[in-house]
């Protein structure tokens, strides 16, 4: 990786999130609004680290002895992209050298957020589990998502709803859906 592609703060933390590797748990809850971070972390047994840089607020602590990090992404897919790239860098890049680590790590990411449609039968602050997501800005085309791309539903939307702009539909992985559908979080 070119050093210009990964900007660090003077303290060695990643630029936007102001996090270092040791500040990050392997389980990360992502929320949009920075005020939602406190709504979640007020239930933590212990807080070990807090930081904020503009809309990016991060808190790491423990809940029932499980270490968790909560990060706010701000608004929009481009902000989420920044957050995910910096989180990935924290676990898969040597921040001193900029070299990709030989052993790659995956984070457990859980997105908790609001949807664009509120229905009378769904109370505010309810938890919903989505089986599909629709990308309206084409941002996800930057990634290889062929394993979850739902081309038939995308075609249906385009043909039956006279949508001019291209939409892309992605399925939640069945493994992830089944895990959350059968577990009380």
What is each of the regions a protein language model found here?
Residues 1-175, 179-182:
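Metabolite-binding pocket within alpha/beta catalytic cores that recognizes anionic/polar moieties
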Residues 185:
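Short catalytic/ligand-gating loop segments at beta-alpha or beta-beta junctions
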């Amino acid at each position: 990786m070119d050093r210009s592609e990964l900007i660090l703060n003077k303290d060695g933390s990643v630029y936007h999130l102001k996090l270092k590797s040791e500040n990050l748990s392997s389980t990360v809850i992502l929320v949009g609004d920075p005020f939602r971070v406190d709504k979640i972390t007020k239930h933590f047994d212990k807080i070990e680290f807090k930081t904020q840089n503009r809309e990016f607020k991060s808190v790491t602590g423990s809940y029932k002895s499980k270490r968790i990090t909560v990060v706010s992404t701000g608004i929009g897919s481009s902000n989420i992209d920044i957050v995910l790239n910096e989180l990935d860098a924290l676990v898969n890049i040597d921040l001193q050298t900029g070299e990709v680590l030989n052993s790659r790590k995956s984070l457990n990411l859980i997105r908790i957020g609001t949807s664009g449609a509120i229905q009378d039968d769904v109370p505010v602050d309810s938890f919903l589990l989505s089986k599909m997501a629709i990308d309206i800005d084409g941002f996800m085309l930057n990634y290889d998502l062929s394993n979850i791309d739902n081309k038939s539903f995308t075609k249906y939307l385009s043909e039956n709803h006279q949508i001019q702009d291209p939409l892309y539909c992605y399925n939640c992985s069945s493994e992830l859906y089944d895990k959350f559908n059968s577990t009380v979080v």
